[in-house]
Amino acid sequence: MVGGGGKRRTAGAGPQCEKTVEVKKSKFSEADVSSDLRKEVENLYKLSLPEDFYHFWKFCEELDPEKPADALATSLGLRLVGPYDILAGKHKMKKKPTGLNCNLHWRFYYDPPEFQTIIIGDNKTQYHMGYFRDSPDELPVYVGTNEAKKNCIIIQNGDNVFAAIKLFLMKKLKEVTDRKKISILKNIDEKLTEAARKLGYSLEQRTVKMRQRDKKVVTKTFHGAGLVVPVDKNDVGYRELPETDADLKRICKAVVDAASDEERLKAFAPIQEMMTFVQFANDECDYGMGLELGMDLFCYGSHYFHKVAGQLLPLAYNLLKRDLFAKIIEDHLASRSEENIDQLAG
């Protein structure tokens, strides 16, 4: 069958006005962060940051005026990084002569271009939180968490940093038995909850905005965070892969486990076939198919798929006019690393 995989009929299919998220900014009072500093962060990352990003920085400044980025280090084991490093001025203290590449700064092994790390936790599991946005010209749709040493799964944790920290704190409170530690955590929880209430941020794990996005998700992908691509009223924009997720994982496993190059080439045949289907799909403006296959291969994690992912993903992102994501994935695949992801270290 030409095109491979049927078209998906989704309830949310229809012309998509993806700019609605911008409304959020006017809802809250602006955080007291200078426009120069805001411009510096957003110019370095080439991404707009939501107001909760700046509000949370001010909240941490109140907890620890000297080192806001470490305000939650002792109590929660969390540190503010990534774009927060720019607010802290860390990039100006950089010793390395090479320039800071924000596309790779705190980009963990499984982080897709849609994910922007803002907080790190336990180094053993590489726990981290980040903003997840469907397109580089939009504000984030939620805060996700991932443990890169375990897998590629991204878990949704509210639509702002306050909610993500609150959920982390609640989990921590269930684990801690020491009275003194419980008291410290409860104190932070009270301050956090009050700050979020004053500013009007929801502390829910799944908000109405997030549920609305769910209706636009065309496929979950291996990372589970879902992909959103424009699908018009004629259902043009996405078509399903001819293989289920389980089958695709089996195909990937066969490639990785192959005993010889010859076997590996044979095991690669179904992927080659799917790439042909993607070409048909791209010709018919179903750009989501190539994005899904490329993302799944990236998420599987093996270097055997880097070349194919490097062909599929930049093309898909460019066709979707998400050019920054194309650049991020190119940079990431060129130096994909499990360690040394702090661009400001040393």
UniProtKB/Swiss-Prot annotation:
The active site is at residue 284. GO terms for cellular component: chromatin; nucleus; site of DNA damage. The modification PolyADP-ribosyl aspartic acid is found at residue 235. Disulfide bonds: none annotated. The modification PolyADP-ribosyl glutamic acid is found at residue 240. It comes from the Eukaryota. Belongs to the HPF1 family. The modification N6-acetyllysine is found at residues 19, 186, 233. It is found in: Chromosome; Nucleus. Interacts with PARP1 (via the PARP catalytic domain). Interacts with PARP2 (via the PARP catalytic domain). Interacts with core nucleosomes in a PARP1- and PARP2-dependent manner. Keywords: Acetylation, ADP-ribosylation, Chromosome, DNA damage, DNA repair, Nucleus. This is Histone PARylation factor 1. One of its GO terms (biological process) is double-strand break repair.
